[in-house]
Amino acid sequence: MTVLKMTDLDLAGKRVLIREDLNVPVKDGVVKSDARILASLPTIKLALEKGAAVLVCSHLGRPEEGVYSEEDSLAPVAAYLSKALGREVPLVKDYLGGVEVKAGELVLLENVRFNKGEKKNSDELAQQYAALCDVFVMDAFGTAHRAQGSTHGVAKFAKVACAGPLLAAELEALGKALDKPARPMLAIVAGSKVSTKLDVLNSLADICDSLIVGGGIANTFLAAAGLPVGKSLYEADLVDTAKAIAAKVSVPLPVDVVVAKAFAEDAEATVKSVKDVADDDMILDIGPQTAQQFAEMLKASQTILWNGPVGVFEFDQFGNGTKALALAIAESPAFSIAGGGDTLAAIDKYGVSEQISYISTGGGAFLEFVEGKVLPAVEVLEQRAK
């Protein structure tokens, strides 16, 4: 995968437009989770250090396209950036006709989704974005799977289009895990439905040595093995699909599980052998014996890809399985990559972020890359690098 990198370019005196993913939760005008903003800071600082005139753009929320709405304004993000960088970061509302920015200065452009044609990837809008800069930097991996004006279109028309450090690091880490993984490679794929992660499961079944499944997905695999799942969430129509995946790759199944009679924060948790699940039981986590077996496998792996918690970890009594696996990944010598919103929440909860080799910032983009799909925003950078 060959793309131009921002780190290799001379940016002195150049107008540099950086597409970041600053789509953060905001409540009452205050940023509630700053992870994405923090991830973008090194790129912004580097462009300023290189003497560029820097314009940063992003989307936020899902406003009606072409219509300004205060609740989806990037004003709280501009305020946060001003504080974090110790300098005023003006928010520019009307910028499609051009913006005055001097070398060493930084401005934040208002929500790109307020511009008509952003989602449809209109060439006219993309050309207006491109006219704002000498160099376009795509640094938002989380939106790389969307062909939109500020992620894909602008890269077609900008004088120079390159990958920012965040995007480049993401592509490198995913390439390391998927192209030539050190063996043995183990993947954890968990979620409520096989149907939503079918492409991921099939793709990883071709690459991995072992595939640990969790959540509702695991229940479908248990049913495929003829084991009782009680009233747990599972997909009866995908039992044959689960059998086909298990025929391609080793899918170790739980030997014990944690069950409850109801899905509730105060539900009583009971550990049972997987064979003893009753008709009115719901499986909400893997049991301690299973957690130990899976943990040993993780510690013996050389590459680990983790997507999804293996239990309902939001309720502490059903979080022990996910906690045990998180700690095992942290202890493992493997190159480990983790992605997906719930996975990141589990990593935070169990305090293992420092011990995981790479944490992906992109939810949908992460999954599409793992599925082997082409990410439009990356593809256009590759074409421009030729």
From Swiss-Prot:
Instruction: Give the matching HAMAP family.
Output: Phosphoglyc_kinase (MF_00145)
| Subunit and partners | Monomer.
The opening ranks of the lineage are:
Bacteria, Pseudomonadati, Pseudomonadota, Gammaproteobacteria, Pseudomonadales
User: Its annotated pathway?
Assistant: Carbohydrate degradation; glycolysis; pyruvate from D-glyceraldehyde 3-phosphate: step 2/5
- Origin organism of this chain? Ectopseudomonas mendocina (strain ymp)
Assigned protein family = Belongs to the phosphoglycerate kinase family.
Q: Where are the transmembrane segments?
A: none
First-tier enzyme category under EC:
transferase
Q: Where does ATP bind?
A: 197, 314, 340-343
Q: Which Gene3D superfamilies match?
A: Phosphoglycerate kinase, N-terminal domain (3.40.50.1260)
Q: What is its EC number?
A: 2.7.2.3
Q: Which residues bind substrate?
A: 21-23, 36, 59-62, 113, 146
Give the protein's recorded name.
Answer: Phosphoglycerate kinase
Please name the GO terms of the biological process aspect recorded for this protein, alphabetically. gluconeogenesis; glycolytic process
Query: Keywords for this entry?
Result: ATP-binding, Cytoplasm, Glycolysis, Kinase, Nucleotide-binding, Transferase
Chemical reaction(s) catalysed? (2R)-3-phosphoglycerate + ATP = (2R)-3-phospho-glyceroyl phosphate + ADP
